[in-house]
């Protein structure tokens, strides 16, 4: 009965939110490939941030249809950048990789170019990112958890420098290395950074480029979270790694996206509920990386450039395998030329004026679903 109650609580919460499923990938990470190569459906949230000449600047991770997280250091004084998605295999013979223009770059207001403190930035795409097997968002944790979340299966992904290119990244097949957090770190650590080390001592793959994402799974769940962005990687392979802790910046991410729109939220509202459920090996993967289309009055110049798609979670075989899958429709690319908005470190967004309007009210169909679950609760006596 408690198990049924837990499932219904999760479905109730999901039914009233326009939430997008995040942290789900089609590939099974335990399928080891040669030379730590990433398969085409692994890490579908990793993107390449490039300039207009298609020079790779840094990696980023998709958080939602419109938001990508990356490093501030790689985006200084950049006016025109794009995000190339579905990059697990960047075979030059395959020229059909989708790219999205960035119309807002939001570096952390306290980013220090000398110490590299607060080296984090948000990027907003000009049009909604289309999700499929090769392109998906990843979750991020909230900092306000009462206890650390149990994680497993942590990896750093990136492109390996070759002898032919020196320190420059060659866009090819994405690689990955397994890492673990270490508490006693001999490296000098900035605030809001953590230390990790390679788990495979025989690895000769070096992926220590700043900005490379570190990703882990929440234990007992098939749910991937963005743990951090590399701040420092040793030249020795294997070696030590420093990474910027994303959950330490969750409040910043939420505040900035709420101000610029559409807003994001971390998955910590799910944590206490999900981890207390009596499922020992459950596969429930639920998240709240969401935004409400109805809670923002968009400026005309921006709304013309966006075709906001209605998101609705697609539940598939919930009662059989306890997994919730999501699907989102893509927004059409903008036909209106929109100049990117840029944020200075201290002044915020130029031309601010977004007003919050209306109530975050349930759609009629969602209200009916919510009422149905309430009736199930009452009828079952749980």
UniProtKB/Swiss-Prot annotation:
Peptidase S1 domain segment(s): 29-258
Any GO CC annotation of this UniProt entry: extracellular region
Glycosylation sites: 113
Gene Ontology MF annotations: serine-type endopeptidase activity
PANTHER family, per the entry: CHYMOTRYPSIN-RELATED (PTHR24250), INACTIVE SERINE PROTEASE 54 (PTHR24250:SF45)
Alphabetical UniProt keywords: Disulfide bond, Glycoprotein, Secreted, Serine protease homolog, Signal
Entries under Pfam families matching the protein: Trypsin (PF00089)
Name of this chain's protein: Inactive serine protease 54
Broad class of where this protein is predominantly found: secreted
GO BP terms: proteolysis
PROSITE patterns in alphabetical order: TRYPSIN_DOM (PS50240)
SUPFAM superfamilies (UniProt xref): Trypsin-like serine proteases
Cystine pairings recorded for this chain: 154-216, 185-195, 206-237
Subcellular location: Secreted
Family to which the UniProt record says this protein belongs: Belongs to the peptidase S1 family. Plasma kallikrein subfamily.
Signal peptide (residue range): 1-20
